[in-house]
A protein has these predicted regions:
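Acidic-basic catalytic patches of nuclease active cores, encompassing PD-(D/E)XK
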Residues: 1-19
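Mg2+/Mn2+-dependent nuclease catalytic core
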Residues: 17-113
Length: 250
């Protein structure tokens, strides 16, 4: 649909905006499927949805979230281009019949701006809880101690390298900070990786840690390491989840 739209149709347009509400900063971003100017000179936000719903079920009000997405993109676009009005169009493609159904609504920039602000206002309570949680988590990670009386030979050096890699963050010219380690069995590699990574996250050097394993035994080792950290510090504020392959879960 995007390729067939013509030369004046800009596909996959990245949109981003910064808003502050009650002291909390928000970054809103996404990709509009298409933006173009119609024959009347009106800018149109085109949101394309693929659906298997029967044709008679593809109504203008089939899914309010589809309009909401287009309206948020419209609010950002209107702000960036200093537009007074624009159109939001929903384009539905029925995969079984190849039928294309379109609906268009006209909005003022003021309407779209008010809509976006109302969404953020509804989101505020969750944002506050999230900020409070991150503050409590980082505070507890700052007080976290190594859960063993002493490091094993080579373990402190490995943990130090992991911490430095995490603390360095991304180096754009190198595609990010990478650390490749090789160590013998029994050195305590799992704790040597998790503990310093958690300490770095507690200092604001990261938001999440992904620990990827190829075997069930190494997955269990990571879970055991987290359990040991929690046992050593019952006040630790830390959330973790284990994701397994669908083939293993079924």
């Amino acid at each position: 649909l995007q390729k067939a739209a013509g030369e004046g149709y800009a596909a996959e347009v990245f949109l981003t905006a910064e808003r502050t509400m009650e002291g909390i900063g928000f970054t809103i971003e996404g990709r509009a499927d298409g933006i173009f100017t119609d024959e009347d000179g009106t800018v149109v936000i085109d949101e394309i949805k693929t659906t298997a719903a029967p044709t008679d079920a593809i109504t203008e009000d089939m899914n309010p979230c589809h309009w909401a997405q287009g309206m948020v993109y419209g609010a950002i676009c209107a702000e960036q281009r200093e537009l007074e009005t624009l159109d939001v169009r929903l384009t539905y493609y029925q995969i079984d019949t190849d039928e294309i159904i379109r609906y268009t609504r006209h909005f003022s920039a003021a309407e779209l701006d008010a809509f976006l602000n109302d969404l953020l206002r509804q989101y505020l309570p969750w944002a506050r809880r999230q900020l409070d949680w991150v503050e409590a988590r980082n505070r507890s990670l700052g007080a976290l101690q190594f859960p063993f009386p002493a490091y094993r030979p080579g373990q402190r050096a490995l943990a130090g390298e992991v911490y430095r890699a995490c603390a360095a963050g991304k180096a754009e010219q190198k595609g990010g900070t990478r650390l490749f380690c090789q160590a013998p069995t029994g050195i305590g590699k799992t704790m040597s990786a998790l503990f310093p990574a958690l300490k770095a996250m507690g200092e604001g050097k990261g938001e999440k840690i992904f620990y990827l394993t190829a075997r069930n035994t190494t997955q269990a080792a990571a879970e055991d390491a987290l359990a040991r950290l929690r046992a050593a510090d019952p006040a630790l504020s830390l959330r973790s989840v284990t994701l397994s392959a669908k083939e293993k879960a079924c």
